[in-house]
Amino acid sequence: MWMVLSSSPQTQIHNTITTQTCCHHLQSKPKTTRITFPFKLKCQQQEQHQQSNSSLKPKTQDDGIPIEDVKTLAKFKSRHNYIRVLEVSRKADHPFRGSRLLLLDNPGNIHSISFLFKTLTNTYFDVFATIPPIIPNGPIAVLGFGAGSTARILLNLYPDTVVHGWELDPSVIEVAREYFNLSKIERENKQRLFVYVGNALTASLEGGFSGILVDLFSEGSLIPELQEAATWEKLRKSLKKGGRIMVNVGGSCVEAEDKVRDGNVVMEETLKAMRMVFGEKLFVLRLGNRGDDSSLALTGDFPEIETWKNKLPSSLRCYVGLWKPYSG
């Protein structure tokens, strides 16, 4: 999950949507005509800094999208979620042009993004895609499959990768197949992609997973089980020897339905629970305009940086140096 749309199911979005991410945060505001995405990954920030002397700067996720460039393709309630699918016009002057976004829950959590003509997204899904070179050969689990953004990137960039994805809501998988090309991806990768509907925390595979990617949110917050050390011990036991877990742990930009569940507090509780299991072998990558906007966590011994970079596509190498030991 990496965005939040702050509007109730009854709210009509007439003029604007604003977002910040980890979750990006979208809010409807009257008498405005822009959609803004104030969050950007640091790789993108660094590129923009290098262009700061230019008088004609390219559009960034900070810039708005005219509302006429956004179309609602689907909107309905399932047993588990309030589901919306948005499409951003290819004519929009914005980095998200040509994308489709999956929003879930009353706060409007955006769980997936997909572009028609490119693989990478300039979101944390790209960071997830840096894990294959630092894990043993073997299957990767995606816990919180959404519409398949993570799986799509992994399958496109790593021809030998096998992905097993778990999603609780069958309606989300139906939407993924209809609006996010999941049916086509499944047909083309019958021996490489396996999608299951059910509780992701029960995920298991004989022989274990080489890597586990965790992206589990409900009602706008990391699920409570992730604040329990027992959950991480169970996931650790699901790994092959040398395997790793990478987690979207959210941050201050997460807006939960329950206002008591502050995103930054929940993130720290999750990291502390992980620390109880993984000890010093826990690293954090901070994203966003502010240091605590959103974060990812990585377990295991820290890889040798240059070796890791050299095994990645050039467009992903910039993320490697952003990891820091967790010191909470």
Spans of features found by a protein language model:
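SAM/dcSAM-binding transferase cores
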Residues: W2-R97, L101, N109-F115, T130-P133, ...
